[in-house]
Curated annotation (Swiss-Prot):
Required to prevent the misactivation of serine (Ser) with tRNA(Ala) by promoting the hydrolysis of Ser-mischarged tRNA(Ala), thereby playing a role in translational fidelity. Binds directly to the catalytic domain of AARS/AlaRS and captures Ser that is misactivated by AARS/AlaRS, preventing the charging of Ser adenylates to tRNA(Ala) and precluding Ser misincorporation in nascent peptides. The gene is ANKRD16. Keywords: ANK repeat, Cytoplasm, Nucleus, Repeat. PANTHER family: ANKYRIN REPEAT CONTAINING, ANKYRIN REPEAT DOMAIN-CONTAINING PROTEIN 16. One of its GO terms (biological process) is tRNA modification. It is found in: Cytoplasm; Nucleus. It comes from Homo sapiens. GO terms for cellular component: cytoplasm; nucleus. InterPro entries: Ankyrin_rpt (IPR002110), Ankyrin_rpt-contain_sf (IPR036770). It comes from the Eukaryota. Its main location: cytoplasm. This is Ankyrin repeat domain-containing protein 16.
């Protein structure tokens, strides 16, 4: 049987909100920190038990600014779990509204990871600063853009109109983030109330349109094209366009959208490498994407600047099912610029044998 004051038992009582049993246990033991660096206040705030929180703070004088091993305070816990009554109580007792945990996250940032407008309002009304950034350069508005609740974005723009003028340390904007996660209604808010450049690039040269396409969010891509003037042929830092990035991620429907509906050249090349979408799909081993590209008229014999075919990239990546499909579709092996055949690249020399196709063109 657990001794009075056992940390695990105390924490369990707090988690379950059993205030009466907790009082008896603490009175017998004289108080005790919770496990793993958490105080019982952390546990109470995390699980939303305001009555337990108040009892611990008032009857036992527990420090509402105590930190755990991640430097989280009880306010971080309450905010991140969406417990508005606990947030209000802690703020009412003078908790620091913009306290920082590891990685420089404030309670407001943590609240913005959930779709709980009430908690966000509570924090802002008590002076939380939406413009503060964490170690990755994200402010609360940027974090909210990842979650995609349009009401929260509208609220943050109302109380802090300049919150949208932000980018992460790798130059990604809230528009990039909302587009990547496919939040159509959030993107509509960003296009209506913010002034993002249509083809603003992050450190890798990626635009919001590329993000939408490579993640398969065709509705967002269409909106960016129709309402924001995004450029279909914009290139990333390696010269790859949206079509190429869709091939990398295996987004077949997005590829059909680009080629069949928008008229993008299925064999367009990345400027720095001369790779086509077929090359990119083969490099990643996406057999279904290769099928899609071929059905749209892709040239199976296209070569890059090193005279490599899609077969070379499939074999180099050890994507043997993909390589066999290319051979079965009529692609013949050939030497690249160094005289290397694709069949020389797999780790097992026999893997392409029996395909029924000659090794050389």
């Amino acid at each position: 049987m657990a001794q009075p004051g056992d940390p695990r038992r105390l924490c369990r009582l707090v988690q379950e909100g059993r205030l009466r049993a907790l009082k008896e246990e603490l009175q017998a033991a004289g108080g005790c920190p919770g496990p793993a660096g958490d105080t019982l206040l952390h546990c109470a705030a995390r699980h939303g038990h305001r009555d337990v929180l108040a009892y611990l703070a008032e009857a036992w004088g527990m420090d509402i600014e105590a930190t755990n091993r991640d430097y989280k305070r009880p306010l971080h816990e309450a905010a991140s779990m969406g417990h508005r009554d606990c947030v209000r109580y802690l703020l009412g007792r003078g908790a620091a509204v913009d306290c920082l945990k590891k990685a420089d996250w404030t309670p407001l940032m943590m609240a913005c990871t959930r779709k709980n407008l009430g908690v966000i309002q509570e924090l802002v009304e008590h002076g939380a600063n939406p413009l503060l950034k964490n170690k990755d350069g994200w402010n609360s508005f940027h974090i909210a853009s990842r979650e995609g609740d349009p009401l929260i974005l509208q609220y943050l723009l109302t109380v802090c109109p300049g919150a949208w003028k932000t980018e992460s340390k790798i130059r990604r904007t809230p528009l990039h983030t909302a587009a990547m996660h496919g939040h159509l209604e959030a993107v509509k808010v960003l296009l209506k109330r913010c002034q993002y450049e249509p083809d603003y690039r992050d450190n890798c040269g990626v635009t919001a349109l590329m993000d939408a396409i490579q993640c398969g969010h065709i509705d967002v891509a269409r909106l960016l094209l129709d309402e924001h003037g995004a450029c279909l042929s914009a290139e990333d830092s390696l010269g790859a366009q949206a079509l190429h990035r869709a091939a990398v991620t295996g987004q077949d429907e997005a590829i059909r959208f680009l080629v069949s509906e928008l008229g993008v050249d299925v064999d367009v090349r990345a400027t720095s490498t001369h790779l086509t979408a077929l090359h990119y799909a083969a490099k990643e081993g996406h057999t279904s994407t290769i099928q899609t590209l071929l059905s749209l008229g892709a040239d199976i014999n296209s070569k890059d600047e090193k005279n490599r075919s899609a077969l070379h990239l499939a074999c180099a990546g050890q994507h043997l099912a993909c390589a066999k499909f290319l051979l079965q579709s009529g692609l013949k092996d050939s030497e690249d610029i160094t005289g290397t055949l694709a069949q020389q690249l797999p780790r097992r020399a026999d893997v392409l044998q029996g395909s029924g196709h000659s090794a050389m063109t």
